Amino acid sequence: FKSRYFEDYNIGDIIKHSVPRSITDGDVAIYLSTTGSRFALNYSKEFSKKIGYEKQPVDDILLFHMVFGRTVPDLSLNAIANLGYAGVKFVKPVYIGDTVSSKSKIVGVKQNSNGKTGTVYVESTGRNQHGDVVLTYYRWLMMRKRKEGIIDSFEDKIPDLPKFVNHRDFFIPENLKLFSEVFSRMHKLEWQYNSINVYV
């Protein structure tokens, strides 16, 4: 497999990453046993159903790694370092049996002063088998140059990355029962949206 160097990335390029990945019971079992995750939503089918999910969703971090993993052959083979992430949004739940695919758009490029590397900024999107967006995020990587030296004609473009994820972008199922019998001993939460108090 021939990976790209810094010079091969251009603003606006779309990379459709190969080999979509179906999520299996085994993936989830290994993830839960390896990480020790005990989030009830991802750990208990009964809990998930009681609060309004159709079934037990896959842990968000496992989903992230599944989507991220599709991008590695196209983005990471000539990368020296993974420099950061921004604007990570889990848009829709994913379930065992779903198949996720990934696509990335080049949104920024910048030469580094050492002349040996550059920084590539990408926006990656994960979709399920129905074409629904399930995850979006930005990341930036330090990438090797094919040929060392500063390219005089090169124009840096550093994107304006999101500094936070707006709470309005969080996924909340329409039929979510936050205060069913499962939460009978908990206090009600009060969220402040601008000047309106919303009780959930």
Residue ranges: model-predicted function:
Residues F1-G84, R146-V200:
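Hot-dog-fold acyl-thioester-processing enzymes
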Residues V88:
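Active-site-proximal cofactor/substrate-binding loop regions of enzyme domains
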Residues F1-I11, K92-K177:
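HotDog/MaoC-like acyl-thioester-processing domains
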